[in-house]
Amino acid sequence: SGDYSGQNIRDYLSAIDDVAKEPWVDKDRLGCVGASYGGYSVYFLAGHHDGRFKAFISHCGIFDFEAMYGSTEELFFLNNDYGGPYWDKQNATAMRTYANSPHKFVDKWDTPIMIITGELDFRIPYTQSLEAFTAARLHGIDARLVEFEDEDHQVMKPQNSVVWNREFFGWLDKYLKK
């Protein structure tokens, strides 16, 4: 698309602002969750949400665009979505994309985050999740890493799904439930 961190992020924030105006929504107990591209969105929004969210959960999200470029098995995706490689300084689309990599905004993170990943993920390598978890912890953010050694981009094994759901909803309960 060439518009990572662009219109979609503005749409997310506009949508949550509109939803938060509804009388049945407690704007002080909003969470933000996403997987894959949604997981990337969580990382980006963690540095740009201006207090809207009280908890984040990212499942297999992209955290560092440059590291991702050299470690995924799907370069055609990144060449299309990012606009090209990070070393192509003449490519304005690519440079705009890399300038907005979520890892560059960790200094603005201030909200608890759970990070879920599968060690067998070749689409978005689990090291992306490890980097985000480490950054959050070093920045003093309450963070939890849930890592499945026998899963890839999706959690498919029934016993792991039970753990995934327990962890996911436990995190939301911890930070959003009254």
Regions found by a protein language model. Give the residues of each.
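Active-site-proximal cap/loop segments of hydrolase catalytic domains
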Residues: 1-178
